Regions:
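Cyclophilin-like peptidyl-prolyl cis-trans isomerases
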Residues: 1-218
Length: 218
């Protein structure tokens, strides 16, 4: 005899609600959140990658020194922008035309932008700050070398001169003196003078970046 046949109420238990529905809802929310997070990460990564590629590009090189393009009757100045401030340099274009032309060409081509001052010597006595090396360790060059231009200009305080590894090995590296360095006269070609930013020069540290170099022609 069934329980219904004896007049008693059915005692069939109600099935408890499955927890799977709640668990799936939670998992779904977590999955959506995870996908959103991954999407954000991918966006950031793809935004950064182009910049990383730019940083890893090989430095510019050239097969020969640039042709003469400056007008030696005009006055040329360069503004080197750094995070510490600007250095303004006046060139001796009429006296040292080949080297000034070389610097102007490289600067206008963006060669120096992003390079560093890889050598800063102030101790035991003020000496020089040197930059313009495409490798960043003082061994780089633009792919060519050219002869010295030794003139009556000497290494006074703030002199802009070409760094080299011996006679007639000029390329792209340059230095600016913190104090007179006349023992360098006749060995390095002075081609300009710092006219603004000595305080900036004194604050520079090894590794400071040359943001850009702008050439002004008058």
């Amino acid at each position: 005899m069934s329980r219904r046949d004896d007049g008693q109420k059915s005692t069939r238990r109600k099935k408890p609600k499955s927890r799977q529905t709640g668990t799936w809802s939670t998992r779904k929310k977590l999955l959506i959140g995870l996908c959103a997070a991954i999407g954000v990460v991918l966006i950031v990564v793809f935004a950064i990658i182009p910049g990383l590629k730019g940083d890893s590009q090989s430095p510019k090189t050239y097969s020969a020194p640039p042709p003469m393009t400056i007008d030696t009757s005009k006055q040329y100045t360069a503004t080197i922008e750094t995070e510490k401030g600007d250095l303004v340099l006046e060139f001796f274009a009429s006296d040292v035309p080949i080297i000034v032309n070389n610097f102007v060409f490289l600067a206008r081509d963006g060669f120096y932008d992003g390079l560093t001052f890889h050598r800063v010597v102030r101790e035991p006595s003020p000496f020089v700050v040197q930059g313009g090396c495409p490798i960043g360790d003082g061994t780089g060059n633009p792919g060519y070398q050219f002869d010295d231009e030794i003139t009556e200009h000497t290494h006074i305080t703030g002199a802009l001169s070409m760094a080299n590894s011996g006679p007639n090995t000029n390329g792209c590296q340059f230095f600016i003196t913190y104090a007179p360095q006349h023992h360098l006269d006749g060995k390095h070609s002075v081609f300009g003078q710092l006219i603004e930013g000595m305080d900036v020069l004194e604050r520079l540290e090894q590794g400071d970046v040359i943001i850009r170099v702008t050439i002004d022609e008058k």
